[in-house]
Amino acid sequence: QFEDEKCIARQTMPAPAQLLAELYREDNGKNTDTVYPDHEQLIQDIAVAYRTVIQELYAAGCRNIQFDDCTWGMIGDPNYQNFLKESNTKVEDVAAEYLRLNNLALENRPEGLTITTHVCRGNYHSTWASEGDYFTVAPFLLAQENVDAFYLEFDDARSGSFEPLGLVTTKSPRLENKDTVIARIHEAEKYIPLDRLCLSPQCGFASCEIGNKLTELEQWNKLKLVKEIAETVWGK
């Protein structure tokens, strides 16, 4: 009921690394350690749970899954990096663990199943939770995570300088200039072939119950703009 010849339904879910991060957020870690005194066993059980769900979704007909993952946005945030430093924790060690867990969950996935990931920086009522560039996480996330595509937030300067990206924000009703976005896409060709690039909104329009500061019509106008640009660049 969610698909037709032009549309493929997508199932989104928190990334395995996101689940792990939530299990240790603030005081959650005490309860988690009580249930899982062996941290490696927790890693393995999360991976098995995700592999099971992925197989079940595929059996039910799902062919497109997206991991929503705030962990990489946090790792790139200077404030979070300072927090880790004060905790005598290396940023590289955290990134390596998140990468390993996500890839464990992706093992033995069914043929013909597309799995992508969206690096989210928070999207509460047109605000955000983290900022900073992608250079800290790029050697882990972009170079080694075994997904088919990355949906990366980059709608203003808070995301740092990252030349291949130019996206359409979901936090503001203002429509981006079509020619400017197209120019950014072609700029990205300096780094990645055009047939490996895609255009999407920067995040969801309602990542929480209250949603962002856009009307329904303004949201549809954003999606219409994305569609028009995609057809101009890649064809219908």
Question: Where do the model's predicted regions map?
Answer:
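Domain-level signal for soluble alpha/beta catalytic cores
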Residues: 1-236
